[in-house]
Swiss-Prot record:
The lineage of its organism: Bacteria, Pseudomonadati, Pseudomonadota, Gammaproteobacteria, Enterobacterales. One of its GO terms (molecular function) is L-aspartate oxidase activity. Its main location: cytoplasm. This is L-aspartate oxidase. The gene is nadB. It catalyses: L-aspartate + O2 = iminosuccinate + H2O2. It comes from Salmonella typhimurium (strain LT2 / SGSC1412 / ATCC 700720).
């Protein structure tokens, strides 16, 4: 058994987006924190978030209204307590973000007072979205990254992937099962390191990379969900994958999102002949929840045999469009399209994982000392469909609550002196990496075709059979060859793909983001789809 380089901290945070960094900054006043980032520290879904953060700042709005809008969007299976918990703590947590230096757009009211410019997005009954033009995530992420990198108690490790969690019972330690650290793949040095930690937090984001078309960056491979499942944690509602209705249809920008706020400010969805179709689908038109809009676009494309639909805001004044959407306007100009003059081609794409690792109000999972916050988690906030701009808010609120719980418990947690080293004595360098590439493409294509916007029981059964075969191939490959970034992500993706399909097969109805032709109606009563591991997987 080889000797493994070792790291040590009070709290290991796996992920460097809004959830991970807000938690790190709250904890670092009293505790030593390590933050893992799979790529450059700012490369994650937070950085690319365009819309904004939902919170009640307008005196005509109310927390009760925010709660009701979220419950309606969630199609009847949100956890009301979780929704009220998030909405009631929203303003305080957004104010904390402002105190860190995040600059949201402001405007001068008719009475001469300056206030935050609030926009409205799908599902919201009021203007309550704080934003920084059309690049809110970039403003949030760069501010938090700067604060974290300059904090003496925070060590940010870039190009570092968590391989797996280290759990106490695998080491023969007495007492409740708890996390004691993790193995980390250092891509810079191409070796596996062992990290001792009193608490470990999964802030790894979602799993939209499991689909062929996604708005997410390449790192969204479901790592935290897969690691938590292997450690023995329950997962829930993974059948609810949000497909953003309006990803740009262009070969040079396949991951580029056209924010919900465009429709909030009056953009229309049109067929290739220029006619609108959303007013015939829903009384809210283009401001209907995302699942309804995405399904409508998918239906129109299939019915017409069209490659895309079109998003048109050219009827608004040019200056208005350029002022409110400067980043999108500039990006489209680079691609030869003028947002102020012409309709823009759009298609739905996998955007957000509404389910995840089951947690409580403090982000606690089923394993002591292991937390999950942000998109990786299932809090009950989103139900069967996430309402726009509640995702960054969820990151902030659970970053705050998890920090309180970790800080409260820290004095009673004792670190483990010796952790098992990573064993590479029986593996060799990969022989044919084409195996990984082939399985990668096959998995993402079958998930898109069989487990996409519209599903059937037969499609799900086909998907599960093929996923099971892929798992066997990938597990064999993982057992015999040294780890690599692509292998780690593929192993996690195929695990999450299985969980998505199993959750989808449990739900004998159509609800929110899960639509199946075999059960097109919504049941009168329903709840979350919860999967429990029979036995935790054995770490290598």
């Amino acid at each position: 058994m080889m000797t493994t380089p070792e790291l040590s901290c009070d709290v290991l945070i796996i992920g460097s987006g809004a959830a991970g960094l807000s938690l790190a900054l709250r904890l670092a006043e009293k505790h030593k924190v390590i933050v893992l980032s799979k790529g450059p520290v700012s490369e994650g879904s937070t950085f690319y978030a365009q819309g904004g953060i939902a919170a009640v700042f307008d005196e005509t709005d109310s927390i009760a209204s925010h709660v009701e809008d979220t419950l309606i969007a969630g199609a009847g299976i949100c956890d009301r307590h979780a929704v009220e918990f998030v909405a009631s703590n929203a303003r305080t947590c957004v104010q904390w973000l402002i105190d860190q230096g995040v600059l949201f757009d402001t405007h001068v009211q008719p009475n001469g007072k300056e206030s935050y410019h609030l926009t409205r997005e799908g599902g919201h009954s009021h203007r309550r979205i704080l934003h920084a033009a059309d690049a809110t995530g970039k403003e949030v992420e760069t501010t938090l990254v700067s604060r974290a990198q300059n904090h003496p108690n925070i060590q940010v490790l870039e190009r570092s992937n968590a391989v797996d969690l280290i759990i106490s019972d695998k080491m023969g330690l007495p007492g409740p099962r708890r996390v004691v650290g993790a193995w980390i793949w250092n891509r810079n040095k191409e070796w596996v390191e062992t990290c001792h930690a009193k608490s470990v937090v999964l802030a790894t984001g979602g799993a939209s990379k499991v689909y062929q078309y996604t708005t997410n960056p390449d790192i969204s491979s479901g790592d935290g969900i897969a690691m938590a499942w292997r450690a023995g944690c329950r997962v829930a509602n993974l059948e609810f994958n949000q497909f953003h209705p309006t990803a740009l249809y262009h070969p040079q920008a396949r991951n580029f999102l056209l924010t919900e706020a465009l429709r909030g400010e009056g953009a229309y969805l049109k067929r290739p002949d220029g006619s609108r179709f959303m007013p015939d689908v829903d009384e809210r038109g283009e401001l209907a929840p995302r699942d309804i809009v995405a399904r409508a676009i998918d239906h129109e494309m299939k019915q017409l045999g069209a490659d895309c639909m079109f998003l048109d805001i050219s009827h608004k004044p040019d200056d208005f469009v350029r002022q409110h959407f400067p980043m999108i306007y500039a990006k489209l100009l680079d691609l030869g399209m003028d947002l102020t003059k012409e309709p823009i081609p759009v298609v739905p794409a996998a955007h957000y994982t509404c389910g995840g690792v089951v947690v409580d109000d403090y982000g606690r999972t089923d394993v002591d000392g292991l937390y999950a916050i942000g998109e990786v988690s299932y809090t009950g906030l989103h139900g069967a469909n996430r309402m726009a701009s509640n995702s960054l808010l969820e990151c902030l609120v659970y970053g705050w609550s998890a920090a309180m719980d970790i800080d409260r418990r820290m004095p009673s947690v004792h670190s483990v002196d010796a952790l098992p080293a990573w064993d590479e004595s029986r593996v060799e360098n990969a022989d044919e990496r084409v195996v990984i590439q082939h399985n990668w493409h096959e998995l993402r294509l079958l998930m898109w075709d069989y487990v996409g916007i519209v599903r059937t029981t037969k499609r799900l059964e086909r998907a599960l059979r093929r996923i099971t075969m892929l798992q066997q191939e990938i597990d064999e490959y993982y057992a015999n060859f040294r780890v690599s970034n692509n292998l780690l992500e593929l192993r996690n993706l195929v695990q999450v793909a299985e969980l998505i399909v199993r959750c989808a097969m449990m739900r004998k109805e159509s609800r929110g983001l899960h639509f199946t032709l075999d059960y097109p109606q919504q049941l009168a009563e329903s709840g979350p789809s919860i999967l429990s591991p029979l036995t935790p997987h054995i770490n290598r």
